[in-house]
């Protein structure tokens, strides 16, 4: 027993070291109220030990049972002990790997590693390249290798020093050891349960203060990955149960002013505004991880995006636009088809691909040729199948580019893809059919590759890559202006999602979802609009401006006709609603609610919060219901 308990303690020490590494690396994420409060911060490590011990007890329970059984039958071999230690070394190695991987994951997403990572599992080569192509991931990998090596060496040394007691065939002599073993197993089972209450330990037990960084620091990454994965397979968690489906749909129809038929309850006829005369080409650019907070227009002190800032001032721009989620597939899905994201689910994946009435289908019906350009492989996130099923005629991806232009697991760099797209679009002389070209950039996503021909001004790699992304966009527009189709084209630029910029002011930092949205018409009148805008609203707003009438069945609104009371969006495990002063966050898996007002924790009794909750719950629940029922197209 002593050997097993020694390995148990040693494993807990290694997890504590990895937690300390995350704390140091993410120290800037501490809220102002928590900074400098060592006592408050130390409680996160205490909670971490609590959660680490749960995983440790899962690892320990089988070796304890093996040793107890060998003692009960009077086995005289060291083999059970050796096998038990090897078992523990293997599973502890997995736990260390998850904790090490959680360091860059948390620093990027401000969330502990969870079941959403399985979405990347089927893209082995791409994911492998992402992991080993980003230099900032090397320190956690090195820490894992060093700590695992030390752990194995120390546990082996501890096992070799242990002297087996002389075997006895008398049961009475073995009874004390058996009693001790049974007691240890009982304590281990209690450790797995984690607490004495009616329910076993859950992630919510780690939340002890108002600082989201400290609250999440106390959660063991392997525990979070395990429980979130198991939750995915539980029937009661397969679907969200925010409110009754009928009530949600009734509320949503009232909010959106829709009275469609039973098989298409949100259907309506979009009335074009015909603001932009003539049938214009459309270029839609998704900017990878482009948080609005990178732009000086939104308070950024460094000059990272001079071109975007200039374009923002000379376009129809929306200051309060929010992404549907925090992953690229969410941004594509919401912007192109006007449906909200459903937490961390990738709604473009699956062999049974649903069909949608979206921007590509509406433009195709209006006589457009639809093209999609991406930097990586077309199979990633099931894009090729999903996009071709839902309105796109041509897909250009890594398979189309020269191999020497591929720089990492996500394919070519932005400026190459932009130049390639311009060559493809050269076949449109302005006299033939109009085109709708969608370009998905990638550079502002790890692993970062800054080309040698670009000279950034900032010092940090994460800001240098933003400078490069902006520079590549300028290059695209400089070349596009020389094309005969340029003056007859509408350009739409939007962030697919954001990323953490600056400090984390809440459990779900605003910079993850606050994205720039610009509709640029050469020669048009610039305007900055400040009403709430969502990625879902791009389709109806753009069609209205283009003068294209279309039957719609989705959650988007024409921002020139309808104003939303607030913004709503998701971020993996939470759903959120935001107005000018309030921010509401709900975690369906735990039922936890967070209320903020003017950036500070607030009382949820405010009636406005209740209205925001109803708006949020109605939209998300209705979207899930319509998708479940296959009611995603016009009738």
Regions found by a protein language model. Give the residues of each.
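Generic structural signal of hydrophobic/aromatic residues within well-ordered alpha-helices
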Residues: 42-45, 65, 127-131, 226, ...
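Surface-exposed, active-site-proximal loop segments in enzymatic domains
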Residues: 72, 239, 452-454
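Short alpha-helical "patches" and their helix-cap loops
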Residues: 78-79, 236-247, 348-352, 556-557
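The feature marks either
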Residues: 123-126, 207, 211, 218-223, ...
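Transmembrane and membrane-interface helices of multi-pass
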Residues: 1-236
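Long, well-ordered, tryptophan-enriched scaffold segments
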Residues: 137-142, 146, 246-257, 387
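Solvent-exposed soluble domains appended to multi-pass membrane proteins
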Residues: 256-635
